[in-house]
Amino acid sequence: MTIAFQLAVFALISTSLILLIGVPVVFASPEGWSSNKNIVFSGTSLWIGLVFLVGILNSLIS
């Protein structure tokens, strides 16, 4: 269970860093938002899901 928790935290941190860099790049590009909004929404949904997963796994471990 600890390995699953560690992998979930790593995935959350990785997704956060990707979104931290990717979202401003999408907004700065000329037609970035209209062509990449599905990717941004998918990444945001993944991030929210990982936050809940880490919370659930944390409650099971402690």
Curated annotation (Swiss-Prot):
The chain crosses the membrane at residues 8-28, 41-61. Gene3D superfamilies: Photosystem II PsbZ, reaction centre. One of its GO terms (cellular component) is photosystem II reaction center. Keywords: Chloroplast, Membrane, Photosynthesis, Photosystem II, Plastid, Reaction center, Thylakoid, Transmembrane, Transmembrane helix. It is found in: Plastid, Chloroplast thylakoid membrane. Its main location: plastid. InterPro entries: PSII_PsbZ, PSII_PsbZ_sf. It comes from the Eukaryota. It holds the Pfam family Ycf9. GO terms for biological process: photosynthesis; photosystem II stabilization. It is a multi-pass membrane protein. Belongs to the PsbZ family. PSII is composed of 1 copy each of membrane proteins PsbA, PsbB, PsbC, PsbD, PsbE, PsbF, PsbH, PsbI, PsbJ, PsbK, PsbL, PsbM, PsbT, PsbY, PsbZ, Psb30/Ycf12, at least 3 peripheral proteins of the oxygen-evolving complex and a large number of cofactors. It forms dimeric complexes. May control the interaction of photosystem II (PSII) cores with the light-harvesting antenna, regulates electron flow through the 2 photosystem reaction centers. PSII is a light-driven water plastoquinone oxidoreductase, using light energy to abstract electrons from H(2)O, generating a proton gradient subsequently used for ATP formation. NCBIfam families: PS_II_psbZ. This is Photosystem II reaction center protein Z. It comes from Pelargonium hortorum (Common geranium). The gene is psbZ.
